[in-house]
Amino acid sequence: MYRLSQYETPLFTALVEHSKRNPIQFHIPGHKKGQGMDPEFREFIGHNALAIDLINIAPLDDLHHPKGMIKEAQDLAAAAFGADHTFFSIQGTSGAIMTMVMSVCGPGDKILVPRNVHKSVMSAIIFSGAKPIFMHPEIDPKLGISHGITIQSVKKALEEHSDAKGLLVINPTYFGFAADLEQIVQLAHSYDIPVLVDEAHGVHIHFHDELPMSAMQAGADMAATSVHKLGGSLTQSSILNVKEGLVNVKHVQSIISMLTTTSTSYILLASLDVARKRLATEGKALIEQTIQLAEQVRNAINDIEHLYCPGKEMLGTDATFNYDPTKIIVSVKDLGITGHQAEVWLREQYNIEVELSDLYNILCLVTFGDTESETNTLIAALQDLSAIFKNKADKGVRIQVEIPEIPVLALSPRDAFYSETEVIPFENAAGRIIADFVMVYPPGIPIFTPGEIITQDNLEYIRKNLEAGLPVQGPEDMTLQTLRVIKEYKPIS
């Protein structure tokens, strides 16, 4: 029996062959290879892309019931990532994360999650009716960012909630730090609890020994992995890797099908196929070059007065067992400006767009799509930034914001989300139970999640983020003059 090679792209190749046959199409999409589309957009996108913007007709397989080229592409991805099964997601990693949670949890089931999870985890908890048991991540006081969860916090949570249906871990974090995932997996498996990994920012780590251990290498049961973020596929295309044992693979397939559009994007699927090929066949060399380039940037930034780019010196705690050096965190705290101010300045003065900013930092991602031309421009821009804002630093101006305690969960997120609610002024909200998500996006980590008790400290933290110009999102009232809370009833007198 013929076995496909990692150098092959069964899905992409079949799409190209189909387009070359130039069939007469009496099926959707209605633009018919671009002929029925606005000419300006058609010219910009190009004929080849529009020719493979197709639908799941018989010759092209079906993502919901793959038997041909999609199955072959998914099987190759499973082999490349060390999984037993891989499912392509065109709902992004958010769709894959929601699939993981809903595959193991039903109404009332407990799931152990770090409090710094992405909104998609909380959305899945609301849909499933699961009860989140929050584990507090380690906070870095200097950088003002959350790291991963520690082995101690996982052990404590497992001892107190041994009936949990799943443990969710972020590996690595948005900022590139990773805990000892292998030990966490072993600990959870000793309780027969499956480990679900949010690997949104770690598609590349599987392909280089110097990077943190990947979810599949660590023995995790499922991992939602963003190929588009750092692996070279198109935006919104991701994969869900699964190992057999503690999870029901057929149930996983049913859930991801429920959450996936039936109008499948073959352009996104093809981009996953070719990205897998490149990672599997060239990934190690490409990532090695990327690491070297990123380290050059890190060293150069640390030579700039008042700027700091963390590296290996951050390692040594349970939550910082390893890190991804391709994530360039630039702390501007000592310059006396916020990360958001630095982001805006870089955009306006150098036409540079960063991944995200927060109160203290900007985050830049170096991938194998970068060259020294781009990184040298970044270094020059940061040198200029330091020189311009040096006066504030010399005067001792410092941005200081206390990170508040995690709010107490009073109601399950599902109960809170579907409860009767009312809208009250922002300044009167302390002590009430929130019905909305409130988060800074990116990274999309909730400040409040439905069901939590609003505290004055957290309201002040939101206000500080707003004053700094950061994108606070979630509430119906985008001005944040009001918040939606659970309705209170007064007793009948």
Curated annotation (Swiss-Prot):
Pathway: Amine and polyamine biosynthesis; agmatine biosynthesis; agmatine from L-arginine: step 1/1. Its cofactor is pyridoxal 5'-phosphate. PROSITE patterns: OKR_DC_1. The keyword Translocase does not apply. It catalyses: L-arginine + H(+) = agmatine + CO2. SUPFAM superfamilies: Ornithine decarboxylase C-terminal domain, PLP-dependent transferases. InterPro entries: Orn/Lys/Arg_deCO2ase_major_dom, Orn_Lys_Arg_decarboxylase-I, Prn/Lys/Arg_de-COase_C, Prn/Lys/Arg_de-COase_C_sf, PyrdxlP-dep_Trfase, PyrdxlP-dep_Trfase_major, PyrdxlP-dep_Trfase_small. Coiled coil: none annotated. The keyword Lyase applies. One of its GO terms (cellular component) is cytoplasm. It is found in: Cytoplasm. Belongs to the Orn/Lys/Arg decarboxylase class-I family. This is Arginine decarboxylase. The lineage of its organism: Bacteria, Bacillati, Bacillota, Bacilli, Bacillales. The gene is speA.
